[in-house]
Amino acid sequence: MSATSTRNKHSKIHGNEKVDITKDEFARMRLALQDEEFRKLFFDYVDEIQDPENRKIYEQEITQLEKERGVDVTFIHPKPGFVVKTAIDGELKCFINICGSQIVERPNNEVAINSETGERGLTWSIPMAQAPARDDIDANKKLCKVFDVVFHPDALHLGTRNSQFRKCLIDTALDGVEREFNVNLDRANLKYPKLDYKGEPHATVIRKLSKNATAEEREPHPLEHTYPKKPEANAGKPKVLPMKKNVTSTPTFAVPKYSIKHSHDIDMAQYTDELDAKLQVTIPRALIVEIELPLLSSTADCQLDVTEKSVYLLSERSGAKYRLKLDLPYTVDDKSGNARFDTEHRRLCITLPVVRSSAREQRQMHDNVRILSREDSGVELNSNSESPAEDEEAGSEAIVELTTMQQTQTDNFDAFPPRQSFLKRDLHYQMVANFDCNIVENVMAFLLHVPNVQPDSMRTVIREGRSVHLQFASMGSGYYPTNYAFLVQLPDAADPQLHIDHVEPDASDDNVVLRLFMSESCMTLPSYLAGPDATDLTEYACFPPCKTNIEDENCDLELDKPLRISTYHNELNKSIEVTIIPQDISEQVHQEQQQEEEEEEEQHEQQQHQHKKGNKKQRKRNKKQRSLSESAFEDLKAEQQQQHQKQQQQQEKLPENSSPESLNAGSSEPVATLKLPQRKQRSFSECNDSSSVQRGILKRFSRYGPRPSISESSSSIDDCSSSYSCSVDAAGIGFSHSFGGIPEERVIADAELSESCKKTVRFNDHIMKKMFRLDSSILGQRKKNQKRRDCKLRAQQRRVSEGDSVDYEEVEHASNGQQTANKTAANAQYFKQPQNNNNRSYSKNNKNQSLHDSGLDLTNNNNHNNEEDTKRNEADAKNAMIFEMDDDDDEDM
């Protein structure tokens, strides 16, 4: 039923007969179609009608029947040409088939001269035939209308060769459809689909009276009412339509259909008996503007501009060009509105809230209504006067005051003419939101930041030489103009002789420049007034105040004394600070600043030293250290006391006038035995209080890169053995360094370290890299590398324990009591393992044999004690290197 209703609705709109069917008829048709035999007969009937041979027989019978009535019938079979697509009344889609037939007469032309211009040309006469409109469906299965317009094939051929003649054919077809069927076609949105013919071709019938009809044929037929009405006598003559004299240009844009609805809210306050209950009843809450856009599927190509009093719509899409400019009956809030496009009905709905009067205006209106509705009782109330004379005096004073106020208002209106004298009443003017003012000599220039200003719309007026009023229009993005007004007025405090001579406005694409030429220099002008009109002016300063940082403006500088000028650039605030003080004061201030900076640096260093905590590597080193047992510590303490006594005896034997240089040169004891500030080294035992060593800055080496030479970075060995001359082989990489070639000064107790104790660091250019295989996981490689490092570490410890155990046993049982006995005991305690026990037994059985060859050159003329000291120092150096390797492996793990 919905499809039938839709078809009937459109048929009724466009003049066709409405199909009226009852429920009984519809039920019978439904039952009949359920019968298989009826459906078979119905399909046979359809095939018979569509058969071309049967159509010819049908046309012959119709021709014979009409001839018996004295009517000649001619069937026109249209041949496809091309199709024009448009819309009817902007709502229903429409197709016009431009066809050809030999029955239609050929187009002819005549030579004619234009009476107005005198030009010579051709006047064409183009015959055509039209068929009644029929319903069809488009590609989206929606209802549409189809019209057939038939021309001679020669006319179609000329249209294919000449574009102007083709346009003439299209205009002729559109005019014929609009005239015959009383419809409005959308000529601004014509489309030409790739079709030769829309729908199934239908034959068109031309009916006219027979010229040689007999008397019998002219007699009325008994069944005349069942046949079509006979044509009139002049029906056979073709209609000749004169050419349009005033040819209307084809519109570029179509005007869509629209409607404005007033939306109200139900407010219960309007149903009370208050006087102001219905003051806003006639003003709607919002305006709803509905615009029909049947040729648009979305509003992506639409431009919509909404102002307080108008709505402007523009669509430049090919085949769907719309333009609408609509004035609104009420002032609306364009910032709070919303728009929604209904894709099903192709309708744009715009909701705009109406701006109502403010609370102040409503209150004033309420008071006025209350005053007007007050009834006069004839009795005067609240009279404070005691006699009629006082009333007369009060009345006279009131009259004088009122007259004065009226005179003042009249003067003001005379000084400033009303706004309507220059600005138009029907336009809404806006104030320029952003502008700048510059003053140079007698020129006052205003830069108004308004783009796309039309130069033709600029108008200026000078009022009494004290103010200038400017109005102009700017074209927005939707080609909708916006009007602006700008009034500049000189303040009352300005010089009375200063006035405006003339004005030069200049408009560009980005802004407007307004130059005011004064009668004299206006550099001293403090301010000016600006606004849209004389009733709404705001005061602006010509020169903004400068920012100064002068704290004391009353300070006097003595010019006789030399001055110190300093500047400070502040990039953050974009400012410059200039300080001017006398020279003597500046020196004192400079010294005080230096002292304060030094104190701050010392405090900062102390805080860092106090809050400094050991990192993760230091904690790992501390975990690796092992403490000695109590028994070993007691033995070391006893040996240390014996050593201290021997040192005191040796110092007493030395001559009193001996210098530190002679001690260093003649003494067989190493320099490290002298008293220096005690500093601890991880590679030696912490029980040795007399050791004075310093740890190298770049001691910890990487396991995966080449170890740097001792010449590049100082290590712990040169700190402890600076007076020895030795050669060390570490981790299979041979490198040597002379520890005795660098003379170092050693100061006895309570002396500071000399410059020779400072470390010099040199960095190598070698870059350490870590490679990973692509076909294995990182965790798997890490476990393998860790196992490999553990095996290497155990092998190195095993070799050292087997090769150096003899040296440790000799040092442990030595009775000379030298300085490094405690270190040897600590190392022996640290490396106590089953293999070491076997080495000790082996070393006891071979005491008289030569010691293990460690690669050190020990041949000298010193006594036996010095040789033993040298051996112990070599063993300590090797142990230190082993500890360093151990630490490096732990870090890698």
UniProtKB/Swiss-Prot annotation:
One Gene Ontology CC term in the entry: cytoplasm
Single GO molecular function: protein phosphatase 1 binding
Subcellular location: Cytoplasm
Positions of modified residues (Phosphoserine): S377, S801
UniProtKB keywords: Cytoplasm, Phosphoprotein
Acidic residues composition bias: residue spans: 594-603, 884-893
Compositionally biased region (Basic and acidic residues): 214-232, 865-877
Record field: compositional bias (Polar residues): 656-667, 684-694
InterPro entries: Kintoun (IPR034727), PIH1/Kintoun_subfamily (IPR050734), PIH1_N (IPR012981), PIH1D1/2/3_CS-like (IPR041442)
Highest taxon in the source lineage: Eukaryota
Pfam families registered for this protein in UniProt: PIH1, PIH1_CS
Function: Required for cytoplasmic pre-assembly of axonemal dyneins, thereby playing a central role in motility in cilia and flagella. Involved in pre-assembly of dynein arm complexes in the cytoplasm before intraflagellar transport loads them for the ciliary compartment.
Family as reported in the entry's similarity comment: Belongs to the PIH1 family. Kintoun subfamily.
Subunit structure comment from the entry: Interacts with Pp1alpha-96A, Pp1-87B, Pp1-13C and flw.
Protein name as annotated: Protein kintoun
Taxonomic lineage: Eukaryota, Metazoa, Ecdysozoa, Arthropoda, Hexapoda
Gene: Nop17l
